[in-house]
Amino acid sequence: MCKSRLPTVLSLTLIYISISIGFSVYFYVLMEAAYDQFSSMFESYTQTAVHLQSNSRTLKSDLSDYMQLLNYSRKFDESGEESVLRRHNITTPRVFYIDLNYTTALGAENRNLNMINFYAIPYRYVDLLDPFGNSIPVTGRTPATEYIDCSRDKKEKCIDSIPPFDGVLDCLSLDIHMQPWSRNNKSFNRPIIIWLGEVAGELWRLVAGGLIVIRANYRRGCYGFLCHHDQSLPYRNQGVNDVLHAIDWTIENARHFAGDISKITLAGHGASASLVEYIRLNHGHHLPLDKYIVMSANNFGSRDLYCSSNSNVMVTTARLLGMPPSPATESGKERSVYESVRYLSFVEPKLVMSKLYGLKAAFHPCPLSVNNRRASTFGIGFKTKNHTSSNCIRTANEQPVLFTNTLNEYHNFVYGSTVFTHARSETILRTIGDMLSRHFIESRLAYANSSTEKLIQQVNGQYNVVDGEFVDYDAFIRLLTDFAFIMPTVKMNEFTTECGGNSYHYVFDFGNSTHGDDLKMLTSSANDTSLTHFQRQLADGLGFILSKFVRRGYPVKKQDGWCPSTGLVAQIMEMNTKDENVVVKKSTEGVLIPLLNQSYVLHFHRVSVAKQKCYNRLGNVPFWNDLLKFHQSARRGWRDGDTGCARSKYLSEIV
């Protein structure tokens, strides 16, 4: 019986094995075909790809083919496999990819703006079991054919410290924006600007200026800037560390997208600008950064910041969210900080941020060393007893730094607002005094006006009143510089350079602009219907000037052939010399933005005959007479539609 069943069992076993092998071979062939199909489809239907080596499936260390632009003849919409691309979140006919040190990143083209976008490329990982602690490196991926889809803007951001507390903990990613150029010359490298924090729109104007824009996230609030006095705890300045890691990532991977590591600019706006200023002051000496852009920063970036501990508020927050009281220990509060942070690591981040917001807790970078006095560096060299406008002691050159403010921010700074104070206010004040002294006799320059009393106290200590003579600010009115609103003066640039500094300050003055208006205009869409033609010109000018600063380290000069600005300034002047605008400006404190003097246009509001008498008391009558002559001639030319560059000769002769 058993013998007769044995062949049957063996036969069934062989049949089962054969079927299994058959299915295995079938699935293997099917998967191989699917892989080849997708690979073929990926290469065939990618009309344009940014790639760094000839073999798309391997990562080679020898980057012989530099930024090759690959074109394929077949069209995307002719493919019956379009759905396959979409299943892989690839929905555009032009897909770009770059091989980084650890993976391949897929991007997409914005044809309207002629730029390639790579979104949410991870540069570090946040340890979700310890989100207040050190981040985790991004390790290499195998096989090399794996990729990450960076073609869609997922709006990734770190959790915010203000309502509605949007964002996630594992947020350490960056976006890359660049032009789809094709070069095989390794010397063809583009300057890089690392922009910290989120922006509402696109920084396409900087890309159009020939830059590679990298927008980097960093941890904020208690997760990024927990500050306490126990150096042994790891929970300090993680937001600063995140930025330093982003800089390291850029340096390590720049060669993959034709980035010039000798020209890297760190930039930010608002709170991010304060972080830029903090890094410049505390880490700039050892970072390979070329320049800095600080837009609308507040005083928390300054070097004289006091290290205020967040210990108590973290303990209070943890207890309010359910942490039981800890026993008394020798380390006291600092031990409680550790326990509180460990407890809050497992609490919903929105709850943590919401509770801290209700407690009015503030988190800012904590200095490496606390300095109880004002910093002695003002961006234009050290101020000494022997320092005058024509004789300054040369100090070590620093990396060029560009400060920008809107008009209202500047006013708030002048009048000592506790809400907004510029991070480098000393630079502005010192520049005012030094630049004014280049055109006026120091002993005869004095300020007497109720709206400028504080400015008198801060700036004018070196000037004395002579014969009871005063210069009225309303009579002095207001001077604007090249490209009115946003361009610093050439004389100011020359002065800062000869004194050993590279600090420039722009004031954005458009419609009594407030915090963030300059950034909104810079990132506005090219076809934004809410902007007038003039506003679009102004936005393009912002991008132009910032791009020039990143590329060269100094702002636009008349040698650049920036003649179109003359026509733009004409529109600005016509708009701001209307009677109703003058009334509004007079009602605003701090109506003078004294960034003097040279540029294509030095601008006065409408000048009455009575006020013109005041100009004769300003010490340099020929200068003002020539200026008014230019002002009148230029306005006639503008009304006649004359947009030539010839009229710039007036100012070149004046100054």
Curated annotation (Swiss-Prot):
It holds the Pfam family COesterase. GO terms for cellular component: membrane. It comes from the Viruses. It catalyses: a carboxylic ester + H2O = an alcohol + a carboxylate + H(+). Its EC number is 3.1.1.1. Belongs to the type-B carboxylesterase/lipase family. PANTHER family: CARBOXYLESTERASE. This is Putative esterase. The lineage of its organism: Viruses, Varidnaviria, Bamfordvirae, Nucleocytoviricota, Megaviricetes.
